[in-house]
Amino acid sequence: MRKDFDRYGLIEVCIGEVLRQLKDWISLYKVSSRTLGKHSNEKQKIVSENRILTPDEMRGLLKLYPGQFSNTFIDQAIERGDICVGAFVKGRLAAFLFCSLSTAPDKRGLWVRVKKPYRYGYKSYTNPEYRGLRIRLAYVSDTFFLDREFTHAVSYIERHNLASLKRQHRRGQHTSVGYVIVITLFGQTFFHHTPGVKKIGFELYQHETEDQVLPT
């Protein structure tokens, strides 16, 4: 705990701990945006070929990564028009990133809705042997979306996830948009989006079914 105080500050740690204890009833999410094409100056430590996966290649992920996806997840991602960007090293898939231009599933039965010109990345994975080599598909994929007239990436982080918030702040490319508050009481879930979040068309909501929810 003392290390956390030194790293994040007393107030931040206390806020984070309170929210962590209350997460079954109330969650606070910080929403941020990044201008596409504006990213970290860190260079990849390995050369990769980055391209959009075809629908057949997306279905092929089921065999490459057993247990990561369901057939429904992949089929409905394709149906929605989601884009999966892959990084290939010497012809082998090293990492991938799923991005939505409309709606996307998240954990705990929540879904995300975005509107053009914003895109939302919701599922990524890097093979263990390529981790630490700075294959940052969230950045190198920007050109694919700029070509489609999307100008910003939007993301959200739980307010008690101090490590992720600090990492995002350190990189310096993200602008705070606002917050989403999710309250669950007596089996009912209520959402409050601050004005900045509403302005960009970002929305968290609860889907009527959970068959696409991301694996934990």
Locations of regions flagged by a protein language model:
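Charge-rich, low-complexity intrinsically disordered segments
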Residues: 179, 187-188, 194-216
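Conserved acetyl-CoA-binding loop-helix of GNAT-fold acetyltransferases
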Residues: 123-146, 166, 170
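Short beta-strand micro-motifs in enzyme catalytic cores
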Residues: 25-32, 83-85, 117, 181
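Conserved active-site alpha-helix within GNAT-family acetyltransferase domains
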Residues: 159-179
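Conserved catalytic-core motifs of GNAT/GCN5-like acyltransferases
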Residues: 27, 174-189
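A conserved beta-strand-loop-helix scaffold within acyl/acetyltransferase catalytic domains
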Residues: 63-128
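Conserved GNAT acetyl-CoA-binding A-motif
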Residues: 147-158
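Acyl-donor-binding surface of acyltransferase catalytic domains
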Residues: 1-53, 64, 71-73
